[in-house]
Amino acid sequence: MLKQADIVVTNPPFSLFREYVAQLVEHGKKFLVIGNMQAITYNEVFPLIKADKLWMGVTIHSGDREFRVPDYYPLNAAGSRVDENGVKYIRVKGVRWWTNLDHGRRHEKLPLMTMADNIKFSKHKEVRGIGYETYCNFDALEVPFTDAIPSDFDGIMGVPITFLDKYDPDQFEIIANGDDRDEMEALGVPPLGPEYVGNAGRRKVGVPSTKKAAYKRLFIRHRTKATKGKKK
């Protein structure tokens, strides 16, 4: 059936997401599948994102979604329910559409303010009037919110994985996955010191003010005229 399909649209078990997407790519299929947001950092998935072979779909950019489950499925999770016909549903957080079908939303440029304007006008108290930090062990800017990315910063930035919801491949270049130890080593990121309790010795980027490792960061930078259209 897979070999005969032109486009695959499905909701595979999240536990098999890595293997299933790899199979679709291996067979050269166009696809639209539901998966967990955390799949961004999977070692088998991130290279596809970085190489511009996998991206987010048009809908589902936040919150959770409701899914029908079999009659035998236990309803232990919060938000689960049974409708008037006895059909069971659960709500799942952090789900997204994953696809290799191009769409217009993917090429919408993210509107941004300059660093100075972010510090002055940002809606985020962590940025407004405070500014940005550079990691203790890596020369990159910590950007805690996607809409706080400075438009005029040319260096590498660490952003939340939810950045991919707004990612325009013509506007930004994805450099590395902060959860990938090998990529961090290749970038020259040394292990964190003992003051980073719980992450000492790990190749994570450290935030000086909190003495904590930044949670699940993607490293990006603005595309320049020289890199626009250039894919790795």
Identify the residue ranges that each predicted region occupies.
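Class I S-adenosyl-L-methionine-dependent methyltransferase catalytic core
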Residues: 1-232
